[in-house]
Amino acid sequence: MRAQPKASHFIDGEYVEDAAGTVIESIYPATGEIIARLHAATPGIVEKAIAAAKRAQPEWAAMSPTARGRILKRAAELMRQRNRELSELETLDTGKPIQETIVADPTSGADSFEFFGGVAPAALNGDYIPLGGDFAYTKRVPLGVCVGIGAWNYPQQIACWKGAPALVAGNAMVFKPSENTPLGALKIAEILIEAGLPKGLFNVIQGDRATGPLLVNHPDVAKVSLTGSVPTGKKVAGAAAAELKHVTMELGGKSPLIVFDDADLESAIGGAMLGNFYSTGQVCSNGTRVFVQRKIKEPFLARLKERTEAIVIGDPLDEATQLGPMVSAAQRDKVFSYIGKGKAEGARLVTGGGIPNNVSGEGTYIQPTVFADVTDGMTIAREEIFGPVMCVLDFDDEVEVIARANATEFGLSAGVFTADLTRAHRVADRLEAGTLWINTYNLCPVEIPFGGSKQSGFGRENSVAALNHYTELKTVYVGMGPVEAPY
């Protein structure tokens, strides 16, 4: 098997195996080939990982932020040196095209290590508060053992987005990747050890639905950060709430992307395509409800159809390929069921909706699909599909489209395309979403906070704001005179 790791888990600085765990097969989505076979963590493996993290964390927390940051910056250097190797592994693990992974996956993980490694000394500070003769000061202190639970769309990036702020803040982490994409996080753990990270601080264990509760409910875990679906997020948040654990939830969305009639048409179409077809549509922040002002609807659709049908679909390891397969057969079948619902409920199929002709029969491919004449009540306009399916809806005016855009349980992202920047900012203020883009879409540099509102989650990944979710504030009051007591 061409991507078989040394063992299933990485604990306390070394690979660990326990063949008693349920078998997890990593499948290359383009061909159906089994590229690795691993085992889910047994309760004993979970205990071993958490114990290693708990043992290593206090000494790590006692180091200066500068010293911790230096190690993370070295890890970033190593990731960049091995970008090709890591990108090919990510492509095998997920099915995403190499032309995408080589610029967007390990590189964004390296950016995260570099950013947090550099910003920590200045960001992990407190305040001095004069109180007359007395004074107080505050300091940010680490939480302890943190659990990261990843999704299968950006496995290496998510491991770094959670690991970097947790580690630089002085915590230890046990990270569980998705069972669909188990390989990349193991390489991140290897690189961190090579960069000088003390053993036990970043542990990776494999698992399935039975593993998550063992981690979330463990009494030594102080924090859980999840990237996943809304139903999973509710279960994890509920379990964490029972023990008052800290949580960050980055969940799903059904985000609106609004195109006004004065927008640059090519840019708006490009933004809509990036917000629906990048990573084969498997991006939580995708703008899958594309509201197009009625005046430009048909020109928009005509050009969108032309550009969509020119997308190169094929072998993800071919650098000419622009769109790869879905991550799994189960996800492909789920997306096809939504396409069927769109047709049945009266949406107009503009393009796509089937299997490409030029691909392996064992691959989990779907044509990029565009529906028009979609109405707000249709299933494809209400539920997260998580595949390359774009819904185009008509609108007439600003007030109407804002109300319709907000009429959803989700609130992860939103986008606005218009030449009128005054209107752009006004609309952005009124849209109920945690992350918004104006005249672009789905750009998430590490310098800016990323996260949602409503049922799309809470807390933020990236930027200095993320450090607040991996630390808590300690206040110290210093008395400078005798204590006055009425006793």
Curated annotation (Swiss-Prot):
The modification Cysteine sulfenic acid (-SOH) is found at C284. The keyword Zinc does not apply. InterPro entries: Ald_DH/histidinol_DH, Ald_DH_C, Ald_DH_CS_CYS, Ald_DH_CS_GLU, Ald_DH_N, Aldehyde_DH_dom, BADH. The keyword Oxidoreductase applies. Its EC number is 1.2.1.8. One of its GO terms (biological process) is glycine betaine biosynthetic process from choline. K(+) 1 binds at S26, I27, D93. Keywords: Metal-binding, NAD, NADP, Oxidation, Oxidoreductase, Potassium. Its cofactor is K(+). NAD(+) binds at G150, A151, W152, K176, P177, S178, E179, S229, V230, P231, T232, G252, C284, E384. Binds 2 potassium ions per subunit. Involved in the biosynthesis of the osmoprotectant glycine betaine. Catalyzes the irreversible oxidation of betaine aldehyde to the corresponding acid. Belongs to the aldehyde dehydrogenase family. This is Betaine aldehyde dehydrogenase 1. The gene is betB1.
